[in-house]
C-alpha cells in the first residue's frame, strides 16, 4: 500500500541496503508485486492444518485464497488510476476473484459469509471468522497497541473515559448509507456523552452554553472491552483501554464478491447474473431483518450500473475500517480517481438535514486548489534525510 500513499519508492528487497538506489516507477513496483504474488500462489497451501499456521479452524498464515484475493485487487488497482490499464486488467481481476469464489463454493476453501453482519467484527468470531481470507491476529496479553479501541470515537463520549477522536464518519456518507443491520453494526446507533446516562442521537448538542467541539457519526468496528465481552453502546461504564486484540481483517470474502461484480461490470464481460447474485448475497445480509426487501439488484441491470453498485457496496461493506483493510474506501476512490471530486465537495461543506429540522456539517473544513499531490502523503523525513533522491517529485504515473 505504500506506493499508493507516498508515490514512487525505492524498489528494495529486505536484504538490500543501497540508499543511493534510484526511485522505481509505479509500473516497476506493480510488476514486482504481481511477480511475487504469482510465485506465492504456487508456494502456499489452500488450508493449513497445524499450529501456528492454523488455529481455531481458520488459517493464520497466508493461504492460497488470500494470495489470489490480493492479486485480484492488485489487478483492480492496475486497471484504474494512475496506470489506467483498463478492460484487460478488470478481466484479470474478475478471473482471479472468481477462482477464490468458486473454490469457496466447492469447499476447497472453507471461507463463507457469516449470516449476520454484526458478527463480522464481533468478539465472538474474532479468532475464528470463516469470512476472513487474510487477517493479522493479536493477543492482548502482550500489552501492545494493536487495535486501539479508543481511536474512532469522540472525546466527549462516555465509554472508556472518552475516545481519542482520531477519526469520525463523514456526515454525507452516513446519510447515504443504506439502513439495515450493516449500518447498525458499523456506526454507534446511539451514544452516551460524558457524565450522562441518557442515550442520544449522534447529532444532539444538548448544552448551547458549552457546545460540542465535533458533532459527527462515529464508527464502532474497532471498539472492544478489556474483558472480552461484546461492546455495549448502552453501557457508559463499560471497561475499555487503549490496547485491544481484535483481528485486523485485511481481506474478507464479501469484498471478493464485490470486486468480482465490479470487475465484471467495468470490463463489460462475464456473467451479469452471477455477479448480481453475489452482490445480492452481500446486500441481503447488510439489510438483515431491519429491511424486508431482498435481491434489490436485478440481472437486467447494465454493466455500468453493476460496476457502480458493486463499488458502492464495497464502500459500505468496509466503511470505517481503515485500520487494517487492504482496500479501504479511500483506496477505491484513489483507483477510480475520485478523490479530487470529493475534495471539491468537501470544500462546499453543505449543511445536511440529518433529522427533521436538524442540520449538521463537517467540523473540519477543506480549502485550497486541487492538484494530484494531494493524493499522497509527504515522504517521511527519516527516509528522505538518508536518501536525497526521495526529495524529487515525479509524476504519479511514472
Task: Give residue ranges: language-model regions.
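Structured, solvent-exposed acidic/aromatic patches
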Residues: 1, 8-11, 15-152, 238-253, ...
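Short, cationic motifs built from Arg/Lys/His that form the positively charged side of catalytic pockets
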Residues: 7-10, 252, 283-286, 314, ...
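Acidic side chains
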Residues: 1-3, 36, 180, 247, ...
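Intrinsically disordered and other compositionally biased segments
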Residues: 12-13, 325, 332, 396
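Active-site-proximal region of nucleotide-activated glycan assembly enzymes
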Residues: 261
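Residue-level signal for pocket-adjacent positions within structured domains
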Residues: 16, 328, 372
Amino acid at each position: 500500500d505504500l506506493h499508493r500513499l507516498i508515490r514512487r519508492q525505492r524498489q528494495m528487497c529486505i536484504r538490500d541496503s543501497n540508499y543511493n538506489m534510484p526511485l522505481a516507477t509505479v509500473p516497476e513496483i506493480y510488476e514486482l508485486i504481481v511477480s511475487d504474488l504469482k510465485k506465492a500462489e504456487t508456494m502456499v497451501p489452500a488450508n493449513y492444518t497445524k499450529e501456528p499456521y492454523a488455529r481455531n479452524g481458520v488459517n493464520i498464515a497466508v493461504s492460497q485464497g488470500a494470495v489470489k484475493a490480493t492479486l485480484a485487487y492488485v489487478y483492480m488497482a492496475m486497471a484504474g488510476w494512475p496506470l489506467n490499464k483498463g478492460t484487460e486488467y478488470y478481466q484479470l481481476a474478475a478471473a482471479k476473484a472468481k477462482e477464490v469464489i468458486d473454490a469457496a463454493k466447492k469447499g476447497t476453501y472453507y471461507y463463507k459469509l457469516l449470516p449476520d453482519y454484526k458478527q463480522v467484527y464481533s468478539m465472538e468470531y474474532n479468532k475464528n471468522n470463516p469470512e476472513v481470507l487474510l487477517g493479522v491476529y493479536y493477543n492482548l496479553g502482550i500489552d501492545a497497541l494493536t487495535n486501539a479501541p479508543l481511536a474512532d470515537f469522540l472525546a466527549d463520549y462516555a465509554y472508556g473515559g472518552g475516545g481519542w477522536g482520531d477519526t469520525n464518519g463523514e456526515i454525507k456518507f452516513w446519510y447515504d448509507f443504506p439502513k439495515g443491520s450493516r449500518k447498525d453494526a458499523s456506526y454507534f446507533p446511539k451514544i452516551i456523552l460524558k457524565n450522562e446516562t441518557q442515550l442520544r442521537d449522534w447529532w444532539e448538542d444538548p448544552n448551547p452554553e458549552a457546545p460540542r467541539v465535533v458533532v459527527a457519526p462515529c464508527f464502532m468496528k474497532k471498539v472492544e472491552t478489556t474483558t472480552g465481552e461484546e461492546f455495549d453502546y448502552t453501557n457508559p461504564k463499560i471497561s475499555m483501554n487503549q490496547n485491544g486484540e481484535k483481528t485486523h481483517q485485511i481481506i474478507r470474502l464479501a469484498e471478493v464478491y464485490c470486486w468480482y461484480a465490479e470487475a465484471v461490470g467495468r470490463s463489460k464481460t462475464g456473467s451479469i447474473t452471477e455477479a448480481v447474485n453475489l452482490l445480492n448475497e452481500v446486500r441481503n445480509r447488510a439489510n438483515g431483518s431491519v429491511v424486508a426487501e431482498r435481491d434489490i439488484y436485478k440481472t437486467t441491470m447494465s454493466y455500468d450500473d453493476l460496476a457502480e453498485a458493486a463499488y458502492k457496496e464495497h464502500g459500505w461493506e468496509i466503511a470505517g475500517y481503515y485500520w487494517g483493510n487492504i482496500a479501504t474506501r479511500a483506496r477505491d476512490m484513489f483507483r477510480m480517481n475520485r478523490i479530487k471530486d470529493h475534495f471539491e465537495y468537501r470544500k462546499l461543506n453543505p449543511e445536511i438535514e440529518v433529522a427533521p429540522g436538524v442540520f449538521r456539517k463537517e467540523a473540519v473544513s477543506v480549502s485550497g486548489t486541487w492538484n494530484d499531490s494531494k493524493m499522497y502523503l509527504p515522504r517521511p523525513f527519516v527516509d528522505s534525510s538518508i536518501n536525497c533522491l526521495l526529495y524529487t517529485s515525479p509524476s504519479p504515473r511514472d
